[in-house]
Curated annotation (Swiss-Prot):
Residues 1-62, 75-128 are annotated as: Disordered. One of its GO terms (molecular function) is calcium-dependent phospholipid binding. GO terms for cellular component: exocytic vesicle; plasma membrane. InterPro entries: C2_dom (IPR000008), C2_domain_sf (IPR035892), Synaptotagmin-15/17_C2A (IPR047897). One of its GO terms (biological process) is vesicle-mediated transport. SUPFAM superfamilies: C2 domain (Calcium/lipid-binding domain, CaLB). Belongs to the synaptotagmin family. Pfam families: C2. Keywords: Repeat. This is Synaptotagmin-15B. Residues 75-88 have a biased composition (Low complexity). Gene3D superfamilies: C2 domain. Residues 200-317, 331-452 form the C2 domain.
Length: 474
């Protein structure tokens, strides 16, 4: 059926029809109800093609063509189908009609998404604007292995109802393709400020940087935490030494009534690049009481090895405080080291930490001291390893680790000999003292206790001080 569409509002049912405009052919009624389902009014102004019929509709060429004037609802165009606006396909007598486009008349316009309101040729009513609805996509995703990936449309704003719904109203664990998933970029949690071992005296954070050209050692004192004060309140300060020189030191400001002080102070030591690797940085943490007396809480020893000074950036380091031994040194000095045995790998580990109170032979020139670690079996030499030499200090610090291959069946007859040796001028050397640890066959006292504790705590480092004795090397 033909439908007459008019942009002008339709008159009320009770009002008379408006008079025909000049030039309007009889039998035409352009009035249409404003509702999409209003019926068309038949025209009675003149003769038509038949009784009770009117004229309406437009052809694709812009000509007015007759159409039956009946009361009907305007059909809606289905998605993907074009609505027919042309002349009726049959004549009033039922015979099919054939239409020819006049020469010079414009060709039918191609369908577009939007048309403008314009007057049609031959005095017809203006065309009604319309918009073609967009086609709906059936899915928002395309499998990666599918060949449709290149031709698939991309929607920058996907419908929210197609995404997983969570109780909080967000996207939950869903992540769009191309977006960054923050779960993949989580850094491991820093537990240095939360995990403190049993019996910890406190922890100190500092930074070390060495300027090669200016020969300056830059030390940054950052903070301390979990300090164990002898009283209810703690007022800490830190003294910095550059061993072996213990006469000169630098001191931080005192922080009042806190066990977790924040220092953020910087210190400079002038030291030659030739001797920097032989120096040891010492931090002594004190508590200042009401009488302004200094009570030692603990200390940190940090050897300035080559690997710690590589690079242009400043290294931030933390160390646990250690209690300073209050026992007077033995006659020939003392040596501190750790023992550990891994029964699964059959590996015996020795960590040489430091020595104190050494009796150096300072008769000639500059001297240096190192420690020689020897593995013995049935008092026979098996293997030997040496630490680096520390220049002219009676309290050298090493912090060096050595490992030996030893089966569990050999531990009953094996022993370790640690000898402190002083280098003299030329190729001469002098033994300053020696410690032997092992089973009951070779040792007694603290040396035997250290060995037995190592066997009872596999894969753990057991640390102890031992007095040096002056004996000949086997």
């Amino acid at each position: 059926m033909g439908v007459v569409l008019s942009p002008h509002p339709a008159p009320s049912r009770r009002e008379p029809l408006a008079p025909l405009a000049p030039g309007t052919r009889p039998g035409w009624s352009p009035a249409v109800s404003g509702s999409s389902r209003s019926a068309l009014r038949p025209s009675t102004a003149g003769p038509g093609p038949g009784p009770g019929t009117g004229w309406g509709g437009t052809a694709a060429s812009g000509r007015w063509v007759p159409a039956p004037a009946v009361h009907c609802a305007a059909p809606r165009a289905a998605a993907g189908h074009q609505q027919h606006h042309g002349p009726p396909l049959c004549s009033p007598d039922g015979a099919p009609r054939r239409f020819k486009r006049r020469p010079g008349s414009p060709a039918p316009a191609a369908q577009t998404g939007e048309t403008s309101l314009r007057e049609q040729p031959h005095g017809g009513p203006p065309a009604v604007p319309f918009v073609v609805p967009p086609t709906l996509q059936g899915r928002d995703w395309v499998p990666l292995h599918s060949g449709e990936w290149a031709d698939a449309p991309w929607d920058p704003c996907p419908a929210s109802e197609l995404l997983p719904h969570t109780s909080s109203g967000g996207l939950g664990d869903a992540c769009m393709v191309g977006a960054i998933n923050p779960e993949l970029y989580k850094f491991p949690e820093d537990k240095s400020e939360t995990d403190f071992p049993d019996g910890c005296l406190g922890r100190l954070w500092f930074s070390v940087e060495y300027e090669q050209e200016a020969e300056r050692l830059l030390v940054g004192l950052i903070k301390a935490q979990h300090l164990q004060a002898p009283s209810e309140t703690c007022s800490p300060l830190v003294k910095l030494y550059l061993l072996p020189d213990e006469r000169r030191f630098l001191q931080s400001k005192t922080k009042r009534k806190t066990s977790n002080p924040q220092f953020d102070e910087h210190f400079i030591f002038q030291v030659s690049s030739k001797t920097i690797t032989q120096r040891v940085l010492k931090f002594s943490v004190y508590h200042v009481d009401r009488q302004r007396k200094h009570q030692l809480l603990g200390q940190v020893l940090f050897p300035l090895k080559n690997e710690t000074l590589v690079g242009d950036c400043r290294r931030v380091i933390w160390r646990d405080l250690e209690a300073e031994s209050l026992e007077p040194p033995s006659e020939f000095g003392d040596l501190q080291f750790c023992l550990s045995y891994n029964d699964y790998l059959s590996r015996l580990t020795v960590v040489v930490l430091r020595a104190k109170g050494l009796r150096l032979q300072e008769d000639r020139g500059i001297v240096s001291v190192f420690v020689k670690v020897s593995l013995m079996n049935h008092n026979k030499f098996v293997k030997c390893k040496k630490t680096s030499a520390v220049l002219g200090s009676i309290n050298p610090v090493y912090n060096e680790t050595f490992s030996f291959k030893a089966d569990a069946t050999e531990l009953d007859t094996a022993s370790l000999s640690l000898t402190v040796v002083q280098n003299m001028e030329g190729d001469k050397s002098q033994q300053l003292g020696r410690v032997v640890v092992g089973p009951y066959m070779y040792t007694r006292g603290r040396e035997l206790e250290h060995w037995d504790e190592m066997l009872s705590k596999p894969k753990e480092l057991v640390k102890r001080w031992h007095a040096l004795c002056r004996t000949t090397e086997p």
